[in-house]
Amino acid sequence: QRQMCIRDSDNIPTTLPTGEATTGKLSFKLRVEEVARNIAEFCGFSQGMTYSFESPKVFDKLLLDKDDPMRQAIQIMNPLGEDYSVMRTTSLNGMLTSLATNYNRRNKNVRLYELGNIYLPKALPLTELPDERMQFTLGMYGDGDFFSMKGVVEEFFEKVGLHKKETYDPNAGKNFLHPGRQANIVYDGKVVGYMGEVHPEVADIYGIGERAYVAVIDMPQITELATFERKYEGIAKYPAVSRDISMVMPKSILVGQVEEVIENKGGAYLESYKLFDIYEGAQIKAGFKSVAYSITSVSYTHLRAHETDSY
């Protein structure tokens, strides 16, 4: 209005308003986070929220080595107290504290998840902003075990389009997890998280009187690998052929190694496979185990029984 008075409205050209319209939808990153929430809640987990400020004593509670990178935490200049004096470098303490609170209140079969940031300094003292990384943290005790947690992780990976088979490296080296029940989650050659049973000593420190299980997934890596593109194929007019196969092998051979062989040998005919039994007992030689799979093959052109049996 002031410009019209100064310049005279007759000297101002008539134009149409311009602007950019955007589609009202979630960003790709938020879509991946939404899938994480949906999968966790579908599997019976409730969302929790914990503080980003913690005590440096947390690192001792988690039995971290003195030179562990997670001890390199950012100090708060004006903390409310020692309990909130550093920015967290792992979301695990908040999850274990929440599980302990529920256990002490006699809540049974607790399943919790959290989507929250951790803060990893590039150098100390700070010379630039830290690396903020979102972690998808799952924790539970009561009904369920290591394989229940593994199933949740696999379901999440499938829903965000990670179609390659993830593997589990048992040499995770996490002091806060049970030495024989932990694994790094590896996808496409990258470690994208870890999971396992909480170390009994750590569970005792936090006051959790049952076996507890956790999984921590690095969301930036998952977002980079995820895709929501889907391809569909018609239904094969030839019936699928299923075979049950049982194999005796040394205990040192991992199930993931067996499944890698199945995928490589199955070729184009392989539709699905499922582990349905692992047996160790008197009928099996010491140091060996029996592993049984159900394997389904299908073809869109032809499929003969001897072709299925050949591999």
Regions found by a protein language model. Name each.
Residues R37, M77, L96, A100, ...:
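Generic hydrophobic alpha-helical scaffold/packing signal
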Residues I118-L120:
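Short beta-strand micro-motifs enriched in acidic
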